[in-house]
Structure formats: C-alpha cells, structure tokens
Amino acid sequence: MAVPKKRTSMSKKHIRRNYWKRKGYKAAVKAFSLGKSVSTGHSKSFFVQQTTTKTNK
C-alpha cells in the first residue's frame, strides 16, 4: 500500500481546503444567479414554461 513519505504542511492543507471551498462557493453563486434570473423572467439561455393562475372574485 502506498504511504506518503512526509507529512503535508498546514499551509498546504489550508491552500487545498480553501481552493476546494471556493469551487463550491462559485457553483452556489452561479446556481443562485440562474435561479434569480429565471424567477424574474430575465433569463436568455434557460427556457421555463410560464403558468398563469386565475383568481375567482
């Protein structure tokens, strides 16, 4: 079984963890932005079927 020869430094661990977290953050921001544009009707690349509701008065 392969075993690392030396211990990974704390700074390298933090760099890798921050990079991993940043990828998730960017994906979340992009998803939120797409959801916002779809809900407001300003989306140009995402097609959603519009439904209308009738209210009885």
Curated annotation (Swiss-Prot):
Family matches, as Pfam families: Ribosomal_L32p
Flavoprotein found in the keyword field: no
Database matches in InterPro entries: Ribosomal_bL32, Ribosomal_bL32_plant/cyanobact, Ribosomal_zn-bd
One cellular-component annotation, GO: chloroplast
GO molecular function terms attached to this record: structural constituent of ribosome
Cellular localization per UniProt: Plastid, Chloroplast
Entry keywords, A to Z: Chloroplast, Plastid, Ribonucleoprotein, Ribosomal protein
Coiled coil as UniProt keyword: no
Membrane-spanning intervals of the chain: none
Taxonomy, superkingdom: Eukaryota
GO biological process, one term: translation
Family in the record: Belongs to the bacterial ribosomal protein bL32 family.
Name of the protein in question: Large ribosomal subunit protein bL32c
Annotated source species: Amborella trichopoda
Gene that specifies this protein: rpl32
